[in-house]
């Protein structure tokens, strides 16, 4: 968001382009993934897949000509004569750690630290089993997600399950693949 880009509408990869074309992409936005690009691929694989997608788009474009390019998914959906482009953002781990800490503090407003399991810089498990909130797990997740968005401007997703495995499956298989709602 600092760059003025909407992460839900921008084709973006986080990768250190200064290393080599074989560098691993640390993150890939959902819009790029929709073109069949792996979330943990190498930069050369992203470029190769974008070339393939653009060849496909060119073959179907009016006059078989691409008239420009865009990294904005909505523009690409509206105009089939645009080539798919993407932004390469260098990783900024100190910045990510700062945001991760801010988000962790939001979780602590609702859940005690001993019930928070940090899985990675951008993923945690919250055990809400013994909390006397007068709401469902889904409603509590919505409340926390809304707080994260309002406080940081970052969208969040939740997977809910009766154990860690089911929560992880709910996150990876279901939650990350459904359209975002207003909550």
Name what the model sees in each region.
Residues 1-183:
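Gly/Gly-Pro- and Ser/Thr-rich, intrinsically disordered tail segments characteristic of DNA damage-repair
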């Amino acid at each position: 968001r600092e760059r003025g880009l909407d992460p839900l509408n921008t084709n973006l990869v986080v990768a250190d382009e200064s290393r080599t074309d074989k560098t691993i992409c640390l993150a890939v936005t959902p819009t790029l993934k929709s073109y069949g690009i792996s979330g943990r691929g190498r930069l050369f694989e992203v470029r190769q897949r974008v070339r393939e997608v653009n060849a496909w788009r060119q073959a179907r474009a009016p006059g078989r000509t691409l008239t420009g390019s865009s990294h904005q998914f909505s523009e690409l959906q509206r105009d089939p004569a645009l080539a798919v482009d993407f932004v390469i953002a260098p990783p900024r781990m100190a910045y990510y750690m700062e945001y991760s800490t801010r988000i962790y503090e939001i979780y602590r407003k609702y859940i005690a630290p001993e019930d928070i399991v940090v899985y990675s810089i951008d993923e945690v498990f919250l055990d809400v089993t013994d909390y006397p909130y007068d709401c469902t797990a889904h409603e509590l997740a919505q409340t926390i997600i809304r707080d994260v968005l309002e406080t940081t401007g970052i969208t969040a997703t939740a997977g809910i399950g009766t154990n860690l495995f089911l929560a992880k499956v709910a996150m990876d298989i279901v939650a990350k693949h459904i359209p975002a709602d207003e909550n």
